């Protein structure tokens, strides 16, 4: 069932959305003080569309700070995912995928996390190591559906887990999405995006029916099985694949984080957050064995950084 959600916004975080204060959602970079005097940004100020509790929006948020940008270098616009603002025809004209982060520079739109971060690096006051070769492969891997950090947030493997998530933010979040989709789909401005709305209404509606206890029993059980498989995928990746990407200390890019680390750090943080944990060591319950030493070391390298502390000051997401 969850495969119906292909294109499901890779920038949201239901488990922590309700706890995000408005100031966190709308002023993601305002407390940052640049130590650099200049960047190579164009005369037209870039606009970054983001949301404070988003897994993939955290990638440019951390990168922004690591790259030495000042608080006025890029205009920040919040797209409220709880209210489905990413599904408005106006936003679809900017990004037909309705995903965050999105960056616009004049008439040019960058509509994937990879494109946004690549632009920020290319125009930054402070150089960092760009991903090449195997590092690009790592970025591509963690953006694949079988270890999707967004489905990790919304999955349920039992009635008990489903109830706990529904009683939190998930049911309200899915309902808000569905309401926005159905509202926008019937407007004249939405006509050119009719296929998009049809697919999204069906996909989000299927997941909503599970959490609203309106899905047939067989559909619910299939969802549970997909959820169990997803966590097995995550477990295998963290235990057996991720350590092979990581150094004994520091970051994949070296002593300081590089392009690959911006993506990988946000992915790992989201997976930890979906379990309700606050530290990587707490993953042991889900992993059913100790967290690999390299993963624990990588987590410490990130959680000691000022950029990471600022972005996740209100909690992991």
For each predicted feature, which ranges?
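Compositionally biased, intrinsically disordered low-complexity segments enriched in Pro/Arg/Gln/His
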Residues: 12, 20-21
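Intrinsic disorder/low-complexity segments
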Residues: 16-19, 29-31, 38, 297
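GST-like fold's C-terminal all-alpha helical module
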Residues: 151-290, 294-296
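C-terminal or late-domain output modules
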Residues: 41-69, 73-87, 91, 101-103, ...
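GST-like domain detector, emphasizing the conserved glutathione-binding G-site
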Residues: 25-199
């Amino acid at each position: 069932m969850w495969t119906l959600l292909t294109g499901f916004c890779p920038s949201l975080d239901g488990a922590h959305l309700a706890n995000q204060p408005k100031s966190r959602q709308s002023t993601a970079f305002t407390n940052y003080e640049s130590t650099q005097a200049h960047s190579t940004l164009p005369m037209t100020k870039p606009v970054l569309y983001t949301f404070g509790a988003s897994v993939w929006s955290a990638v440019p948020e951390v990168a922004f700070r690591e790259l030495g940008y000042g608080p006025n270098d890029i205009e920040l616009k919040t797209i409220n995912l709880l209210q489905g603002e990413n599904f408005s025809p106006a936003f679809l004209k900017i990004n037909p995928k309705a995903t965050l982060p999105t960056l616009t520079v004049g008439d040019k739109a960058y509509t994937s996390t990879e494109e946004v971060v690549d632009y920020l690096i290319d125009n930054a006051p402070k150089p960092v190591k760009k991903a090449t070769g195997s590092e690009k492969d790592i970025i591509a891997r963690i953006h694949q559906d079988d270890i999707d950090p967004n489905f990790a947030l919304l999955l349920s493997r039992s009635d008990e887990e489903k109830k706990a998530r529904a009683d939190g933010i998930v049911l309200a979040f899915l309902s808000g999405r569905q309401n926005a989709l159905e509202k926008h789909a019937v407007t004249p401005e939405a006509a050119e995006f009719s296929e998009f709305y049809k697919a999204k209404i069906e996909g989000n509606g299927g997941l909503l029916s599970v959490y609203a206890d309106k899905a047939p029993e067989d559909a619910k059980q299939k969802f549970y099985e997909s959820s169990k498989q997803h966590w097995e995928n995550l477990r295998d990746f963290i235990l057996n694949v991720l350590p092979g990407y990581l150094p004994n200390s520091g970051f994949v890019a070296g002593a300081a984080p590089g392009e690959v680390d911006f993506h990988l750090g946000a992915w790992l943080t989201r997976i930890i957050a979906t379990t309700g944990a606050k530290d990587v060591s707490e993953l042991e319950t889900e992993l059913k064995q100790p967290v690999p030493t390299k993963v624990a070391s990588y987590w410490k390298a990130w959680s000691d950084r000022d950029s990471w502390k600022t972005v996740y000051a209100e909690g992991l997401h």
